[in-house]
Amino acid sequence: MKAKIVPEKTNLHPRNLHKFGYDFEALTTCSSELKNHVFTNEYDTQTINFSNPEAVKALNNALLIAYYNIKNWGIPQDYLCPPIPGRADYLHYIADLLATTNNQIIPEGENVIGLDIGIGANCIYPIIGNAIYDWSFVGTDIDEKAIQNCKKIIENNPKLIDAISLQQQVESRFIFKNIILTDDKFAFTICNPPFHNSAAEATKSSARKVNNLQEIRTKNPVLNFGGQNTELWCDGGEIGFITQMIYESAKYPMQVLWFTTLVSKRENLSSIYKTLNKVSAVEIKTIDMAQGQKNSRIVAWTFLSELQQKAWRF
Protein backbone atom coordinates (compact mmCIF):
# COMPACT_ATOMS: atom_id res chain seq x y z
CA MET A 1 0.00 0.00 0.00
CA LYS A 2 1.41 3.40 -1.04
CA ALA A 3 2.10 5.78 1.83
CA LYS A 4 0.08 8.96 2.05
CA ILE A 5 1.90 12.22 1.41
CA VAL A 6 0.47 14.78 3.80
CA PRO A 7 1.39 18.41 3.12
CA GLU A 8 2.81 20.11 6.20
CA LYS A 9 1.37 23.32 7.56
CA THR A 10 4.59 25.26 7.23
CA ASN A 11 3.61 28.95 7.47
CA LEU A 12 6.26 29.63 4.85
CA HIS A 13 6.31 32.64 2.54
CA PRO A 14 3.57 32.47 -0.14
CA ARG A 15 6.18 32.25 -2.93
CA ASN A 16 8.18 29.54 -1.20
CA LEU A 17 8.35 26.47 -3.43
CA HIS A 18 8.33 24.25 -0.33
CA LYS A 19 5.26 25.68 1.40
CA PHE A 20 3.31 22.44 0.96
CA GLY A 21 5.97 20.28 2.60
CA TYR A 22 8.16 17.55 1.12
CA ASP A 23 6.84 15.31 -1.65
CA PHE A 24 9.16 12.40 -0.93
CA GLU A 25 7.70 10.25 -3.69
CA ALA A 26 8.72 12.85 -6.28
CA LEU A 27 12.02 13.71 -4.59
CA THR A 28 13.22 10.11 -4.53
CA THR A 29 13.01 10.06 -8.33
CA CYS A 30 15.73 12.73 -8.29
CA SER A 31 17.98 10.98 -5.80
CA SER A 32 18.47 7.27 -5.22
CA GLU A 33 20.45 8.22 -2.12
CA LEU A 34 17.39 9.87 -0.59
CA LYS A 35 15.31 6.79 -1.36
CA ASN A 36 17.48 4.82 1.06
CA HIS A 37 16.49 7.17 3.91
CA VAL A 38 12.74 7.50 3.32
CA PHE A 39 10.38 5.43 5.44
CA THR A 40 6.71 5.41 6.39
CA ASN A 41 6.01 6.51 9.96
CA GLU A 42 3.21 5.53 12.32
CA TYR A 43 0.96 8.15 10.75
CA ASP A 44 1.27 6.43 7.37
CA THR A 45 3.31 9.39 6.09
CA GLN A 46 6.61 9.33 4.23
CA THR A 47 9.48 11.02 6.07
CA ILE A 48 13.17 10.74 6.96
CA ASN A 49 15.10 10.68 10.23
CA PHE A 50 15.91 14.38 10.58
CA SER A 51 18.46 13.62 13.31
CA ASN A 52 20.57 11.72 10.75
CA PRO A 53 22.97 14.15 8.99
CA GLU A 54 23.29 11.88 5.96
CA ALA A 55 19.51 11.76 5.52
CA VAL A 56 19.29 15.55 5.71
CA LYS A 57 22.11 15.93 3.18
CA ALA A 58 20.34 13.54 0.82
CA LEU A 59 17.10 15.52 1.20
CA ASN A 60 18.90 18.80 0.47
CA ASN A 61 20.58 17.31 -2.58
CA ALA A 62 17.24 16.10 -3.94
CA LEU A 63 15.57 19.47 -3.29
CA LEU A 64 18.38 21.30 -5.08
CA ILE A 65 18.07 19.00 -8.09
CA ALA A 66 14.27 19.11 -8.24
CA TYR A 67 13.64 22.79 -7.58
CA TYR A 68 16.85 24.67 -8.37
CA ASN A 69 18.52 22.58 -11.10
CA ILE A 70 21.72 22.19 -9.10
CA LYS A 71 23.87 19.12 -9.73
CA ASN A 72 26.60 17.48 -7.67
CA TRP A 73 25.97 19.49 -4.51
CA GLY A 74 27.70 18.31 -1.38
CA ILE A 75 29.35 19.50 1.83
CA PRO A 76 32.24 18.12 3.88
CA GLN A 77 31.44 16.10 6.96
CA ASP A 78 30.48 18.15 10.05
CA TYR A 79 29.57 21.31 8.15
CA LEU A 80 26.22 23.03 8.49
CA CYS A 81 23.53 21.40 6.37
CA PRO A 82 20.71 23.95 6.49
CA PRO A 83 17.00 23.32 5.95
CA ILE A 84 16.40 24.70 2.47
CA PRO A 85 12.79 25.91 2.97
CA GLY A 86 13.84 28.30 5.74
CA ARG A 87 16.78 29.62 3.73
CA ALA A 88 14.49 30.23 0.76
CA ASP A 89 12.09 32.13 3.02
CA TYR A 90 14.81 34.63 4.00
CA LEU A 91 15.43 35.42 0.34
CA HIS A 92 11.73 35.81 -0.49
CA TYR A 93 11.39 38.35 2.32
CA ILE A 94 14.49 40.14 1.04
CA ALA A 95 12.79 40.33 -2.37
CA ASP A 96 9.73 41.91 -0.74
CA LEU A 97 11.99 44.36 1.10
CA LEU A 98 13.70 45.44 -2.12
CA ALA A 99 10.31 45.89 -3.78
CA THR A 100 9.39 48.57 -1.21
CA THR A 101 11.99 50.86 -2.79
CA ASN A 102 11.21 49.80 -6.37
CA ASN A 103 7.54 50.75 -6.89
CA GLN A 104 6.46 47.43 -5.32
CA ILE A 105 8.19 45.51 -8.10
CA ILE A 106 10.68 42.82 -7.09
CA PRO A 107 13.97 43.65 -8.82
CA GLU A 108 15.43 40.70 -10.68
CA GLY A 109 18.56 40.08 -12.70
CA GLU A 110 22.32 40.04 -12.34
CA ASN A 111 22.56 43.73 -11.41
CA VAL A 112 20.89 42.98 -8.07
CA ILE A 113 23.91 42.00 -5.99
CA GLY A 114 23.72 40.46 -2.53
CA LEU A 115 26.48 39.99 0.02
CA ASP A 116 26.29 36.72 1.98
CA ILE A 117 28.18 37.04 5.27
CA GLY A 118 29.23 33.55 6.35
CA ILE A 119 28.34 31.60 3.23
CA GLY A 120 29.50 28.36 4.85
CA ALA A 121 30.35 25.28 2.83
CA ASN A 122 26.82 24.89 1.46
CA CYS A 123 26.45 28.01 -0.75
CA ILE A 124 22.68 27.76 -0.20
CA TYR A 125 21.64 31.42 -0.14
CA PRO A 126 23.38 32.36 -3.42
CA ILE A 127 22.13 29.18 -5.12
CA ILE A 128 18.51 29.88 -4.23
CA GLY A 129 18.70 33.63 -4.85
CA ASN A 130 20.19 33.10 -8.28
CA ALA A 131 17.76 30.33 -9.23
CA ILE A 132 14.62 32.24 -8.25
CA TYR A 133 15.49 35.88 -8.89
CA ASP A 134 18.61 35.65 -11.08
CA TRP A 135 20.50 37.72 -8.50
CA SER A 136 24.30 37.85 -8.25
CA PHE A 137 26.17 37.25 -5.01
CA VAL A 138 29.44 37.73 -3.23
CA GLY A 139 29.90 35.05 -0.59
CA THR A 140 32.35 35.47 2.27
CA ASP A 141 33.64 33.27 5.06
CA ILE A 142 36.63 33.07 7.38
CA ASP A 143 36.89 29.31 6.75
CA GLU A 144 39.08 28.46 3.75
CA LYS A 145 37.71 24.90 3.53
CA ALA A 146 34.16 26.26 3.32
CA ILE A 147 35.16 28.67 0.54
CA GLN A 148 36.85 25.86 -1.39
CA ASN A 149 33.76 23.67 -1.16
CA CYS A 150 31.56 26.50 -2.45
CA LYS A 151 34.02 26.91 -5.32
CA LYS A 152 33.60 23.22 -6.13
CA ILE A 153 29.78 23.53 -6.11
CA ILE A 154 29.99 26.54 -8.44
CA GLU A 155 32.36 24.76 -10.83
CA ASN A 156 29.97 21.79 -10.94
CA ASN A 157 27.19 24.14 -12.08
CA PRO A 158 28.45 26.41 -14.89
CA LYS A 159 25.42 28.73 -14.68
CA LEU A 160 26.71 29.83 -11.25
CA ILE A 161 30.22 30.76 -12.37
CA ASP A 162 29.38 34.32 -13.39
CA ALA A 163 26.70 34.72 -10.72
CA ILE A 164 28.59 33.93 -7.51
CA SER A 165 32.01 35.18 -6.46
CA LEU A 166 33.77 34.10 -3.29
CA GLN A 167 36.03 35.97 -0.92
CA GLN A 168 37.72 34.69 2.20
CA GLN A 169 37.71 37.10 5.13
CA VAL A 170 41.37 37.05 6.11
CA GLU A 171 40.85 39.01 9.34
CA SER A 172 38.37 37.04 11.42
CA ARG A 173 37.67 39.93 13.78
CA PHE A 174 36.05 41.90 10.96
CA ILE A 175 32.81 41.37 9.04
CA PHE A 176 32.65 43.97 6.26
CA LYS A 177 36.23 45.29 6.27
CA ASN A 178 38.27 43.78 3.38
CA ILE A 179 34.99 42.70 1.77
CA ILE A 180 33.10 45.90 0.88
CA LEU A 181 35.56 47.80 -1.28
CA THR A 182 35.48 51.45 -2.33
CA ASP A 183 33.49 51.03 -5.54
CA ASP A 184 31.20 48.21 -4.37
CA LYS A 185 27.43 48.55 -4.27
CA PHE A 186 25.21 45.89 -2.70
CA ALA A 187 21.43 45.82 -2.81
CA PHE A 188 21.42 43.81 0.41
CA THR A 189 23.49 41.83 2.87
CA ILE A 190 22.32 38.58 4.44
CA CYS A 191 23.64 36.73 7.46
CA ASN A 192 22.76 33.78 9.65
CA PRO A 193 24.98 34.69 12.61
CA PRO A 194 26.59 32.23 15.02
CA PHE A 195 23.99 31.43 17.65
CA HIS A 196 25.95 30.34 20.71
CA ASN A 197 28.48 31.91 23.08
CA SER A 198 30.76 28.87 23.33
CA ALA A 199 31.47 25.39 22.00
CA ALA A 200 30.05 23.89 25.20
CA GLU A 201 26.77 25.78 24.73
CA ALA A 202 26.59 24.64 21.10
CA THR A 203 27.13 21.00 22.09
CA LYS A 204 24.45 21.20 24.79
CA SER A 205 21.98 22.65 22.29
CA SER A 206 22.80 19.91 19.78
CA ALA A 207 22.12 17.23 22.37
CA ARG A 208 18.76 18.82 23.13
CA LYS A 209 17.85 18.87 19.43
CA VAL A 210 18.73 15.22 19.00
CA ASN A 211 16.78 14.26 22.12
CA ASN A 212 13.74 16.09 20.78
CA LEU A 213 14.02 14.38 17.41
CA GLN A 214 14.97 10.87 18.52
CA GLU A 215 13.47 10.87 22.01
CA ILE A 216 16.63 9.16 23.21
CA ARG A 217 19.70 10.32 25.10
CA THR A 218 23.25 10.11 23.79
CA LYS A 219 26.65 10.98 25.22
CA ASN A 220 27.98 12.02 21.81
CA PRO A 221 25.18 13.94 20.13
CA VAL A 222 25.12 14.13 16.36
CA LEU A 223 24.12 17.56 15.10
CA ASN A 224 21.19 16.97 12.80
CA PHE A 225 22.35 19.84 10.60
CA GLY A 226 26.05 19.64 11.44
CA GLY A 227 28.13 22.75 11.90
CA GLN A 228 31.71 23.91 12.37
CA ASN A 229 32.73 26.03 15.35
CA THR A 230 32.70 29.25 13.32
CA GLU A 231 29.19 28.46 12.09
CA LEU A 232 27.73 27.70 15.51
CA TRP A 233 29.37 29.96 18.07
CA CYS A 234 31.52 33.03 18.64
CA ASP A 235 32.50 35.18 21.61
CA GLY A 236 29.41 37.12 22.56
CA GLY A 237 27.09 34.76 20.70
CA GLU A 238 24.37 36.03 18.41
CA ILE A 239 24.01 39.45 20.01
CA GLY A 240 27.77 40.03 20.07
CA PHE A 241 28.12 39.21 16.38
CA ILE A 242 25.15 41.32 15.30
CA THR A 243 26.28 44.27 17.44
CA GLN A 244 29.67 44.24 15.74
CA MET A 245 27.98 43.95 12.34
CA ILE A 246 25.86 47.02 13.05
CA TYR A 247 28.84 49.14 14.11
CA GLU A 248 30.79 48.06 11.02
CA SER A 249 27.82 48.69 8.73
CA ALA A 250 27.86 52.37 9.70
CA LYS A 251 31.19 52.69 7.85
CA TYR A 252 29.51 51.81 4.54
CA PRO A 253 26.27 53.83 4.67
CA MET A 254 26.02 54.66 0.97
CA GLN A 255 27.23 51.34 -0.43
CA VAL A 256 24.44 49.05 0.78
CA LEU A 257 20.73 49.61 0.33
CA TRP A 258 19.64 47.20 3.09
CA PHE A 259 21.78 45.50 5.71
CA THR A 260 19.98 42.47 7.13
CA THR A 261 20.51 39.62 9.56
CA LEU A 262 18.55 36.75 11.00
CA VAL A 263 17.81 37.05 14.72
CA SER A 264 16.93 33.77 16.43
CA LYS A 265 16.53 35.11 19.96
CA ARG A 266 13.66 37.56 20.32
CA GLU A 267 15.13 38.84 23.58
CA ASN A 268 18.05 40.27 21.60
CA LEU A 269 15.85 42.68 19.65
CA SER A 270 15.84 45.46 22.25
CA SER A 271 19.64 45.62 22.34
CA ILE A 272 19.81 45.48 18.53
CA TYR A 273 17.41 48.43 18.20
CA LYS A 274 19.44 50.46 20.71
CA THR A 275 22.65 49.84 18.79
CA LEU A 276 21.00 50.75 15.49
CA ASN A 277 19.84 54.03 17.00
CA LYS A 278 23.37 54.70 18.27
CA VAL A 279 24.75 54.45 14.73
CA SER A 280 21.91 56.62 13.38
CA ALA A 281 20.24 54.07 11.13
CA VAL A 282 17.58 55.92 9.13
CA GLU A 283 15.07 53.08 8.93
CA ILE A 284 14.76 49.78 10.79
CA LYS A 285 12.43 46.93 9.88
CA THR A 286 11.68 43.66 11.64
CA ILE A 287 10.22 40.88 9.51
CA ASP A 288 8.77 37.85 11.30
CA MET A 289 9.22 34.40 9.80
CA ALA A 290 7.85 30.99 10.76
CA GLN A 291 8.69 27.47 9.66
CA GLY A 292 6.60 24.84 11.37
CA GLN A 293 7.14 25.27 15.10
CA LYS A 294 10.23 27.47 14.69
CA ASN A 295 9.88 31.24 14.81
CA SER A 296 12.60 33.64 13.72
CA ARG A 297 12.86 37.11 12.31
CA ILE A 298 14.93 39.31 10.03
CA VAL A 299 16.15 42.70 11.20
CA ALA A 300 16.91 45.08 8.32
CA TRP A 301 18.34 48.58 8.46
CA THR A 302 19.46 51.27 6.06
CA PHE A 303 21.36 54.55 6.30
CA LEU A 304 19.66 55.91 3.19
CA SER A 305 16.83 58.42 3.30
CA GLU A 306 13.54 57.60 1.60
CA LEU A 307 14.58 59.67 -1.42
CA GLN A 308 17.95 57.94 -1.59
CA GLN A 309 16.25 54.55 -1.37
CA LYS A 310 13.92 55.41 -4.25
CA ALA A 311 16.88 56.64 -6.30
CA TRP A 312 18.80 53.37 -5.89
CA ARG A 313 19.40 51.73 -9.26
CA PHE A 314 19.55 47.97 -9.48
Swiss-Prot record:
Documented EC number(s): 2.1.1.181
GO cellular component terms listed in the entry, alphabetical order: cytoplasm
Lineage top rank: taxon: Bacteria
Mitochondrion keyword on record: no
Reactions listed under catalytic activity: adenosine(1618) in 23S rRNA + S-adenosyl-L-methionine = N(6)-methyladenosine(1618) in 23S rRNA + S-adenosyl-L-homocysteine + H(+)
Pfam family, one: Methyltransf_10
Record keyword Cytoplasm present: yes
Subcellular location: Cytoplasm
Described function: Specifically methylates the adenine in position 1618 of 23S rRNA.
Family under the similarity heading: Belongs to the methyltransferase superfamily. METTL16/RlmF family.
Name by which UniProt lists this protein: Ribosomal RNA large subunit methyltransferase F
Species annotation: Flavobacterium psychrophilum (strain ATCC 49511 / DSM 21280 / CIP 103535 / JIP02/86)
